[in-house]
Amino acid sequence: NVALSELPDFSCLPGRERAEHHTAGIILAPSLRYMEQAFFDARQHGWSQQPIVEMLIPSTLDDSLAPKGAHVASLFCQHVAPELPGGKAWPEHRDEVAKLMIDTVNRYAPNFKASVLGYRALSPFDLEQEFGLIGGDIFHGALSLNQLFSARPVLGHGNYRMPLKGLYLCGSGAHPGGGVSGLPGHNAAREVLKGRD
């Protein structure tokens, strides 16, 4: 999470005034090859030296999140290992990776680094310690073949209803999983309403 003195001025869409692209999700990954390399680099080293950065600037949609003229942004990178190789630990490398992500954004928006007022970085270790997300997994379980569709979160419980009457699952651990904003909640709410008939 980054506090900014101004909006990013992207080289491909110049301008520091709020524009449509500032209000959308932004993925900084110039090619499929870049994305593939980021994945393999992270598997070998724990994080990619050329990371894929997903960026949101929620203050463009809700001006109560930052003082007038300032903004907040969220930078997210999926390709980081929960456990670092070679005995390295996340608390010692958290800021290094955060600065790498800021530098990555700066390649696409040259005013970005200078506009950073402050930041708070969360590594996979921090996500587990603070929020209980095992291994820093924001999807509450791998999006693997054995945990998709009717098998999410596990086979037999893909209908959002849990074994306890009146208990429904509606987060990233439910179908279709994390990254599909709002759908697990929408689908669970539909099941709740069905149960009221």
What are these regions (language model features)?
Residues 8-11, 61-64, 81-84, 124-126, ...:
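Flexible loop/turn segments at secondary-structure boundaries
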Residues 7-8, 27, 34-36, 40-50, ...:
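Flavin-binding catalytic cores
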Residues 3-5, 15, 22-28, 67-100:
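Conserved FAD/dinucleotide-binding core of flavoprotein oxidoreductases
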Residues 84, 110, 194-197:
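A generic secondary-structure boundary signal that marks alpha-helix termini
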Residues 1-66:
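Mid-domain catalytic core of redox enzymes
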Residues 48-56, 107-175:
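A glycine-rich dinucleotide-binding beta-alpha-beta segment and adjacent secondary-structure elements
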Residues 3-9, 70-72, 89-101, 139-197:
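C-terminal structured subdomain/cap of oxidoreductase catalytic cores
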